[in-house]
A protein has these predicted regions:
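Bacterial Sec-dependent N-terminal signal peptides
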Residues: 1-27
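A sequence-level/structural motif corresponding to short, flexible coil/turn segments enriched
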Residues: 18-340
């Protein structure tokens, strides 16, 4: 049986210094589990203005069905209330999943995730859509919006990964969508007003066909990149910075599947038009680099958290620091024996 776990006070803790340090065991303030249906998943947590915590994710299939789950606790992790925000199709695919949550300026919450249609199947023959939900302070739904799907193009499969409230009271969200132009996934950036109505959307990235083989040399073999947005922040100039990654699949001369993956950092203006794109990680088949979160640093640059792996080795935590123009200043790898 799967349950949602919340471990506080820290989700991730990184130590680095010029001196050797002894690894210390974490001290937990509390550990709580929520859910009893099986298949319950916690995806995002944020501390709220009252010192408690708000969690979103996916509820498994139980008496009330499944779907996007919202749960509020006090400062000690004791549940205050929980709401199932989507349950249109009962237990069929769980109906949806929350991927990121933020408390809004009015004390309510905004959740972005993915909605599954009632006819969705494991082969993705029918499209998922990005789901945006706004609730009041008690988790009662005020409105829902969907982006993507057949209205945007047949078999347009989309997934929402991150949302942030913008300075004008609206929302900026990112994830990915299937591009009918390139026949690959593109980073999708969507701007809405305060009621979730779309103001504009942009597909970003470099989803083009390449020539590559398993040894890293150019060969006349098919190759395509799939770009995905993982995180977005509004910048001081009114534009946006998006962190994510680009993955690719190809076949070598013996028709063996090979692949690669790079971290992406994309800067746009206030209308979502791309100003620049930076890629991090060596562009060789068999190397994996993924960006999962980006933050703006006090010096105006950016810090990216992600993962990297080469060949068959396990992935390691990867931290990249850039200047305001996305040029790498330094990077650090943690795991499998410490900092490198």
């Amino acid at each position: 049986m799967k349950k949602v776990y919340i471990l506080l006070p820290l989700l991730f803790l990184i130590y680095w210094s010029c001196e050797d340090t002894k690894e210390e065991e974490p001290i937990y303030t509390f550990v709580k589990t929520f859910g009893a249906n099986g298949g319950d998943i916690g995806r995002s947590v944020q501390q709220t203005a009252d010192g408690g915590y708000i969690i979103t994710g996916k509820a498994g299939c139980g008496v009330d069905g499944g779907g996007v789950w919202l749960l509020k606790t006090n400062s000690q992790g004791i549940e205050e209330w929980s709401n199932l925000l989507t349950n249109a199709y009962g237990c069929n695919n769980g109906d949806g999943e929350g991927r990121w949550i933020q408390q809004t300026t009015d004390g309510g919450y905004v959740i972005v995730g993915t909605a599954f249609p009632d006819f969705y199947d494991e082969y993705h023959d029918y499209p998922r859509t990005i789901l945006l939900i706004k609730t009041d302070s008690q988790g009662q739904v005020e409105w829902k919006q969907n982006f993507g799907g057949i209205d945007y193009g047949l078999f347009d499969d989309s997934e929402g990964r991150f949302v942030q409230q913008t300075d004008d009271g609206g929302f900026i969200l990112t994830g990915y969508t299937y591009s009918t132009k390139n026949h690959t996934n593109d980073v999708w950036l969507i701007k809405t007003d305060a009621n979730g109505n779309e103001e504009w959307n942009r597909t970003l990235g470099d989803s083009i066909y390449f020539q590559w083989n398993a040894g890293g040399d150019e060969e006349p073999m098919p190759y395509a990149l799939n770009d995905r947005g993982s995180s977005v922040q509004q910048t001081s100039d009114g534009g946006y910075i998006i962190g994510g990654y680009s993955t690719g699949w190809c076949f070598d001369s013996d028709w063996r599947i090979t692949c690669k993956s790079n971290v992406l950092l994309i800067k746009t203006d206030s209308r979502g038009d791309r100003e620049w794109l930076k890629s991090f990680g060596e562009s060789k088949a068999g190397e994996f680099h993924r960006g999962h979160s980006v933050q703006i640093t006090p010096d105006g640059g950016y810090i990216i958290a992600g993962e990297r792996a080469i060949g068959n080795e396990a992935s390691n935590f990867w931290l990249i620091k850039t200047d305001i123009n996305g040029n790498q200043i330094w990077d650090k790898t943690y795991g499998n024996g410490g900092e490198r």
